[in-house]
């Protein structure tokens, strides 16, 4: 795997609040190796460990992107949703930021059918065919289109299972993580002090509640993916 410099520094992570964990009563003992202290009733994440795993994740996504691999970014809680969409669009990744529909990956044939329906409806809307239908039929199909746009809009160009899935919140996206584990899809996951570090392929200990923390982690991963994609374009 290619080793590169990703400009990951502890001061920047401290400013973003990456080190702030959950209250000491809400923790997973498996996170003990990633916790450096307790402060005012909350656990403090060891940022040296965070930097190590973030570096490893950046190397992985760069290497994958440089070989033309496909990524899916998942983060559906309100405070992360816009960041997830922004990061995915910038790095030309697929994303889910509203609600994870159970079986989205493990029942891919059903998802594929929904995507075909979504594409057909979008085409009918663009060509004006929907407006030529009886009002009741048009209204029903427009509601369907709106529903599909909300939940599948971020994966509308996905033609198969992703090669790597990036998950912003382990607890919130547990169903998505389990589907990836079932299918053997490599995962990168932000893990707060109440998470299980053993579930993802690369777990990055970090505050998964603060927007500034989520933004910093996604920024680093997106930059690495974009660099990898540039390398792929130059040397296909």
UniProtKB/Swiss-Prot annotation:
Keyword Zinc-finger carried by entry: no
A cellular-component GO term for this protein: chloroplast
BP terms from Gene Ontology: translation
Keywords: Chloroplast, Plastid, Ribonucleoprotein, Ribosomal protein
Keyword Ribonucleoprotein: yes
CDD domains associated with the record: RPS2
Location in the cell: Plastid, Chloroplast
Chief place where the protein resides: plastid
Gene3D superfamilies named in the record: Glucose-6-phosphate isomerase like protein, domain 1 (3.40.50.10490), Helix hairpin bin (1.10.287.610)
GO MF term list: structural constituent of ribosome
Entry similarity comment: Belongs to the universal ribosomal protein uS2 family.
Protein's name in the database: Small ribosomal subunit protein uS2c
């Amino acid at each position: 795997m290619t080793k590169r410099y990703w400009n990951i520094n502890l001061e920047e992570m401290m400013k973003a609040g990456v080190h702030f964990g959950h209250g000491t009563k809400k923790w997973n003992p498996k996170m003990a190796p990633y916790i450096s202290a307790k402060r005012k009733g909350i656990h403090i994440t060891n940022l040296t460990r965070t930097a190590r795993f973030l570096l490893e994740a950046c190397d992985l996504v760069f290497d994958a992107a440089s070989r033309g691999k496909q990524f899916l970014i998942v983060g559906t809680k309100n405070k992360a949703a816009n960041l997830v969409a922004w990061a995915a669009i910038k790095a030309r990744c697929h994303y889910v930021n509203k609600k994870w529909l159970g079986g989205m990956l493990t029942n891919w044939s059903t998802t594929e059918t929904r995507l075909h329906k979504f594409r057909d409806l979008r085409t009918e809307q663009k060509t004006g065919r929907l407006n030529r239908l009886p009002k009741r039929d048009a209204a029903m199909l427009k509601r369907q289109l709106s529903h599909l746009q909300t939940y599948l809009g971020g994966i509308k160009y996905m033609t198969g299972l992703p090669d790597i899935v990036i998950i912003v919140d382990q607890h919130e996206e547990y169903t998505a993580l389990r589907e990836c584990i079932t299918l053997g899809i490599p995962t990168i996951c932000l893990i707060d002090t109440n998470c299980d570090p053993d579930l993802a392929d690369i777990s990055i200990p970090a505050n998964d509640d603060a927007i500034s923390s989520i933004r910093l982690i996604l920024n680093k991963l997106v930059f690495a993916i974009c660099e990898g994609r540039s390398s792929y374009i130059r040397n296909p």
